Amino acid sequence: LPVAGVIGFVHSYADGAHTSIPAPGLGALAAGMGGKDSKLVRDLARLGVTPDDIAVVSKHDTSTNANDPNESELHNTLAHAIGRADGNPLFVISQKTLTGHAKGGACIFQVNGLTQLFKSGVIPANAALDCVDPKLQRDDHMVWVRKPLRIGGGEDEFGRETAGRPVKAGLATSLGFGHVSGFVALVHPGAFEAAVAKADGEAALEAWRERANARLAAGQRHLEEGMMGRAALY
């Protein structure tokens, strides 16, 4: 099967209050316990990723008084705790500007969006952003873009390869009702390829890559045929 990304770290947390209101707290800060020696940092290091390699965070950003400051503070505080260099921007994808309120499926869209970022190297615009809440000025790492921004190499809209290094990693959080938080760090699929090559050799990697690319091409053909009415999509 093709690999769209590698889970570098995943965990769920609770704040302890467990009050069922849509004002998530900061329980996911526990991902940074230990700072530069936290499990988050150590797990990513096994895949060759440092805190400064994390390029983007995909957040809900509900435009509510409770969510936006909390979620932004969470990621900015974590960035400092795990040793991200001062001045290294952490670009933000505000999920709900792209899909609206997806309810329980929101973080699935966020994770899928990160895999698309690995493929394209382009951060989507927060198109509906008129101004950033002044409360977020304290969060010095966080950057919201209003236009698509290419930050790495990948495929353009015509499938052509563009120059640049791949985007190594991104974060996604799901801060839900009841003060229960989900946190995932996703790593570029190149980490999977490196693991296959190390374990089974370059020949095995090329064999997998050939099968995976054939499956991707077949899926794309099927999608386009369905869009043109030449085949049933489902």
What residue spans do the PLM features occupy?
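Acyl-CoA/ACP chain-elongation machinery
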Residues: 1, 10-27, 59-69, 86-144
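Glycine-/small-residue-rich "gating" segment that lines the acyl/pantetheine channel
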Residues: 1, 142-165
